Amino acid sequence: MAEHPDLFSAPAQEAPEDLGLRAAALRAQLHQWAHQYYVLDAPTVPDAEYDRVFQALQALETAHPELVTPDSPTQRVIGAVMEGLTPVRHTVPMLSIRTETDTEASGAETFDARVRRELKLAPDAPPVEYVAEPKFDGLAMSLRYENGRLVQAATRGDGEVGEDVTHNIRTIRQIPLTLPTGGRYGVPPVLEVRGEVYMRRADFDRLNERQREAGGKTFVNPRNAAAGAVRQLDSGIAAQRPLSFFAYGLGDITPAAEGGPDFATHFDMLRQLKAWGFPVAAQVRTARGASELVAFHQEVGASRDQLPYDIDGVVYKVNSLALQRQLGFVTREPRWAVAHKYPAQEMVTRVEGIDVQVGRTGKLTPVARLAPVFVGGVTVTNATLHNLFEIRKKGVRVGDQVIVRRAGDVIPEVVGTVPAALLPVAGALQGSDALADAASGADGTAPGADAARAAPRSPYVPNFRMPRQCPICGSTVVREKGEANHRCTGGLFCPAQRKEALLHFAQRRAMDIEGLGEKLVDQLVEGQVIRTLPDLYRLGLTALSSLDRMAEKSAQNVLAALEKSKHTTLPRFLFGLGIRHVGEATAKDLARHFGGLDAIMDASVEQLLEVNDVGPVVAEAIHTFFAQPHNREVVEQLRACGVTWKEGPPAERATLPLAGKTFVLTGTLPTLSREDAKDRLEAAGAKVAGSVSRKTHYVVAGEEAGSKLAKAQELGVPVLDEAGMLALLQGR
């Protein structure tokens, strides 16, 4: 759509009909961009451009309220507060789908065999065609359109009667307020779209972060956060929660005989839903027979943790609508569909004890010892409690029934305690995801200390206390001001830290000691062959080859890798020391600024603060590390063992050619990698940022540059290609 010449800057005196045309043009443009962004997942303009047009429409409607239409993008966030949610009786019941109890892929074969049996198909009959789709972990929703306009949105409720949540659903940008006319089927007078309201994982994480910053309760999981938002009485609150929607079916619809669409298959219906502007999951596909259903179950299961949203299984539906009618229903469940779940990712179990683990940096982590429970596809017996403040916040004590979450490779964690009201059924439902669902608050937040305090407990179960001495080495445990975590002060003398410190020192991004893996480090530390980092370079062939499963050839390879690692760089060495808050980028900045290790070791906090991107917390951590005599001794011993690197003069930042300039890199450069370009710019005194702002001096853009380039053009920031950047570096 071409931009209307008067879209943003209207003449001082504009005719009423021109005002209406301008408002219509703005609405049409916003609808088109929203469709591209939310439905097609193919945005064509940066967010800032959308916001600019939105604000222009908003200003126009504010000045001329008579131009506001029900489908205007400005009307999504109404901000009205409802006195209560009104019951809604579904014209077509929102029935549940039978769940296949076999969570293995073979469950698909069971369903296919049942369908073939119900259809009385011969063994040699062609395979049945199905539609396979993800089973979204959200809140079922029914959207009613009359003459193409959204008039009502209702929750599933008990299947017969739900609740009117139209005021909140209108805030979801993926849901069209009006349907486009035209197309193969047109728009029927009555159309009910069934689907799922959900929250993307990234949006959920950002929401919880905002809750924490505001001192509010965090949410248990994306599903409960979405459900809590949908049932808010105040749509302004719902609008602040980033909800999304997928369509997957129809409810009440004008019959074909009265002008409604006459779909032959479920897949045809999904295609039309997309044509009407509804998002349909990209994973949806047709599948012929049991073998393709099994393949779909396995494929989606393997990528489940990489999806941007939660699913708890897949759904199979017979594709032919005629066969669906032939199969019919049994006990209010369709015979033509089944939900094939994956192992649950949240379950309930009992805390049998709380232990404390010590990590590489000395952080003490309380870990709940649990009654074994099968969750996320594995048997879980331990789950992290993070720190003392999380324990107090959640009110966890030994003997409590708790909700445990595990997703993919994420470490299992205790989400919260089971509220007192559910304790009578907790024993019966231990190991159940149903209880985990019920245990969250009505607004989707996690149960915490208040719920735990309400639970009847033995008065003899004390609150957990963090130990004052390290459980591994006996050193004093401290908690720095403003920090939630307790730490052991034993440093490299603590065996728990020693193992992790050795592995960190040896990793590819640090000293790159090939062959020095976890099992070998375990033997070296537990056998007391190594106590400090310099002991690595004192290892001999006899000591190494005498270890379990360490042949002489393998020992020689490790010794050769150790010898090779002696010739390193200052940034790698600094990173390998494992100083808190010092990652690869900070190590490079330190080396570039000071030139040599001695200058870094002797630097004051004030001098460290002069380094690019080093703030008070990082500066204090570096200064504290090198203030410890045993850490300085380790460094000197490593030097004495032959570890060496090339040092240079300290950088005078103010005299560097690009000092004070901020660059942003985007796209693929012809000859330089992103890291190479960054290194060259930083060596010339520039700061390389991750996002474009008014403080950005240059954007360096390569092929397939994204939104950063658009942002630069919008703000008027100069854009360079690789050649331009190199010329700038050479002072041309």
UniProtKB/Swiss-Prot annotation:
User: Where's the BRCT domain?
Assistant: 653-732
Catalyzed reaction equations: NAD(+) + (deoxyribonucleotide)n-3'-hydroxyl + 5'-phospho-(deoxyribonucleotide)m = (deoxyribonucleotide)n+m + AMP + beta-nicotinamide D-nucleotide
Under Enzyme Commission nomenclature, its number is 6.5.1.2
This entry's Gene Ontology molecular function terms read: DNA binding; DNA ligase (NAD+) activity; metal ion binding
What positions constitute the catalytic site? 135
* Cofactor(s) required for function per UniProt: Mg(2+); Mn(2+)
Residues given in the record as NAD(+) binding sites: 47-51, 96-97, 133, 156, 196, 317, 341
GO terms classed as biological process: DNA repair; DNA replication
Q: What is this protein called?
A: DNA ligase
